[in-house]
Amino acid sequence: MTEHNHNHDVELDISNEEELLTLFDENGNEVLYRKMLEFYHPEFKKEYVILAEEGAQSDDDDMIELIPMINEPDESGDGGKLVPIETDEEWDMIEEVVNTNMEE
């Protein structure tokens, strides 16, 4: 079994500035999402965004579903496209970042 050695002392540039994004679901319907968190991780050399569907409500038993994505900038460095998370290591890192930052 391999051990994942994450550098927990890595300084992340984290933005909590909320922004609304319109994305399309698998049926081509527009869905409005709120960007909850955005950060660059130097170990993976990628920028990540954490989204939540706008208007989604949580109750005592259920939490709002957060959707992590990789933000790949275009050639000019602006905008870009959102792509799915690629590895288990990235999922583990994102879970740790989200848990740490959403508690604050």
UniProtKB/Swiss-Prot annotation:
Superkingdom: Bacteria
Taxonomic source organism: Staphylococcus haemolyticus (strain JCSC1435)
Pfam families: DUF1292 (PF06949)
Protein name: UPF0473 protein SH1304
Xref: PANTHER family: UPF0473 PROTEIN CBO2561/CLC_2432, UPF0473 PROTEIN CBO2561_CLC_2432
Cysteine disulfide partners in this protein: none
Family under the similarity heading: Belongs to the UPF0473 family.
Alphabetical list of NCBIfam families matching this protein: PRK13678.1-1 (NF010214)
